[in-house]
Amino acid sequence: MGEIIQFDVLGLPAPQGSKSAFVVAGRAVIVDGSSKTGRDKHALWRSQVSDAANAARGKTQFAGPVGVSVVFYLPLPASDPHRTLHATRPDADKALRSVLDSLTTSGLVRDDSQVYEVKATKLYARDGHWTGASIQVWDASEDELRYRAESKAASRAKR
């Protein structure tokens, strides 16, 4: 495994809302499905992630394939303080999309299409743990080289 950048983001994880498309007077219109409050929370969260990534990355910018692991820590509901696994909203994929876009905004990765491996986990922030996310991004160039070598070896073995 190549270089690893790891950082924590304190705040309230906010998902990236879905967009809706429809036609008005023959023209396509795309709108954000989130409320203004949702958009404000999302903008704040993305800013917090981008700022934390900038502080952690120094001058690093990953140019090749990367792996990303995110553990989201969400508020513990008063109705069930014994839960650990967070199996309610926000959706993990939408929360993850927000983080990946922020990694691009920060310059840590050039484009979120570079992410070839991803893991997202949602947990409740228990026992005084802060809300936010622990994020790890790693250079996967060595994985690329290993897969190519394994592929060549498998091709030779078939001959």
Which residue stretches match the model-derived regions?
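Acidic, proline/glycine-enriched N-terminal capping motif
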Residues: 1-159
